[in-house]
């Protein structure tokens, strides 16, 4: 059975927050995980991160922001049109303008806010708030 690295990564971050900790390290790291972390840093959910080379491969060290509460992968990965974004925001986010959906589009990974500005759809990957 295949392993969902995105779901593992996001549930790891949520568990770290629930334990009351701010710093963590995660292995294995893929380009998708790095892009997710960059979006979360840009949106203010991660204070800082760094990639560390080890004998097992790359490890990502993350410092969570006080604004991070929860993150989770969306399964199944729904294809979403621009006009349907609000429906999924209501479904996955706790309040209006609180949190972000992360979509995979032809222009790379973007948030729901960027997708609305660019008027494009994509495939739902995760949510974070």
Swiss-Prot record:
Pfam families: Ribosomal_S8 (PF00410). Keywords: Ribonucleoprotein, Ribosomal protein, RNA-binding, rRNA-binding. SUPFAM superfamilies: Ribosomal protein S8. InterPro entries: Ribosomal_uS8, Ribosomal_uS8_CS, Ribosomal_uS8_sf. GO terms for biological process: translation. Coiled coil: none annotated. GO terms for cellular component: ribonucleoprotein complex; ribosome. GO terms for molecular function: rRNA binding; structural constituent of ribosome. Belongs to the universal ribosomal protein uS8 family. Part of the 30S ribosomal subunit. One of the primary rRNA binding proteins, it binds directly to 16S rRNA central domain where it helps coordinate assembly of the platform of the 30S subunit. This is Small ribosomal subunit protein uS8. It comes from Nanoarchaeum equitans (strain Kin4-M). The lineage of its organism: Archaea, Nanobdellota, Candidatus Nanoarchaeia, Nanoarchaeales, Nanoarchaeaceae. The gene is rps8.
């Amino acid at each position: 059975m295949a392993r969902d690295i995105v779901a593992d990564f996001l549930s790891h971050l949520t568990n770290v927050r629930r334990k009351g900790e701010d710093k963590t390290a995660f292995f294995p790291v893929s380009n998708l995980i790095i892009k997710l972390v960059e979006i979360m840093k840009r949106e203010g959910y991660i204070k800082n991160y760094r990639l560390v080379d080890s004998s097992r491969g790359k490890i990502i060290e993350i410092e969570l922001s006080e604004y991070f509460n929860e993150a989770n992968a969306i399964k199944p990965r729904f294809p979403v049109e621009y006009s349907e974004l609000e429906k999924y925001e209501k479904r996955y986010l706790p309040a209006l303008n609180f949190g972000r959906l992360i979509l995979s589009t032809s222009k790379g990974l973007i948030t729901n806010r960027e997708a609305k500005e660019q008027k494009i759809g994509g495939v739902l990957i995760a949510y974070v708030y």
